[in-house]
């Protein structure tokens, strides 16, 4: 209700309520780059690290570089997700956009694996082991 009031339109239970824009400016960029794929706030850090030329282990960062060639994907806590070609609303069990059964089933498995990995990271204190291994 608050989101609807602030946005000036009714969203109900729609993933559209999460849409936003991101602008990154750098004086060293020769020309503007426009990215038209879905991304999330967790994708900002790896994107900035890439733009700054910083070395990092991408396996240890949850987000993905927005400027990479990888397809866009945004996951939500209820296992809903948005790809560059379709949206899946887990609460309603609805799909908006065209997707084959094979692609949808594969993405469902991928999303389930991501949530399993996230749960395991949390339950085992994975990053404390990484910090110990790296001597930090």
Please report, for each region that a protein language model flagged, where it lies by residue.
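Solvent-exposed soluble domains appended to multi-pass membrane proteins
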Residues: 1-136
């Amino acid at each position: 209700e608050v989101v609807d009031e602030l946005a000036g339109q009714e969203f109900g239970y729609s993933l559209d309520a999460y849409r936003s824009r991101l602008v990154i400016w750098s004086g060293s960029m020769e020309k503007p780059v426009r990215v038209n794929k879905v991304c999330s706030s967790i994708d900002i850090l790896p994107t900035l690290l890439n733009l700054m030329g910083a070395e990092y282990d991408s396996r240890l960062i949850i987000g993905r570089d927005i400027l990479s060639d990888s397809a866009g994907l945004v996951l939500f806590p209820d296992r809903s997700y948005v790809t560059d070609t379709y949206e899946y609303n887990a609460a309603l069990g609805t799909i908006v956009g065209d997707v084959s059964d094979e692609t949808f089933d594969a993405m469902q498995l991928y999303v389930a694996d991501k949530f399993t990995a996230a749960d395991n990271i949390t339950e085992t204190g994975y990053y404390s082991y990484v910090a110990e291994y790296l001597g930090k």
